[in-house]
């Protein structure tokens, strides 16, 4: 059974596992797969307000559909921010890491920094 059945997920987890977590095993419990199938955060996105929310969305995400992420942004109530990055789901952690981490840092400083 495969929990995240995309080529980029397989590449990310196997390559990252070798480099950063050499004892990691490519295994998942049936309960985790069951919980993953029930994971629908879009159903709760309106309840985040009035807390600020930032969505960093990959333009070509096949793991978490880009269209679904944009729909979530549209459903979210203000205050909300959206950034779209080039690439797929895992590029925010590698190829676009400088940009995604800067965006996240700036958002956190703006909303969680000293007042």
Predicted features along the sequence, with ranges:
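Alpha/beta-hydrolase
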Residues: 1-44
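Short, conserved loop/helix-junction motifs that constitute active-site signature segments
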Residues: 46-49, 75-77
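Active-site-adjacent alpha-helix of alpha/beta-hydrolase-fold enzymes
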Residues: 62-80
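General small-molecule cofactor/ligand-binding pocket signal
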Residues: 83
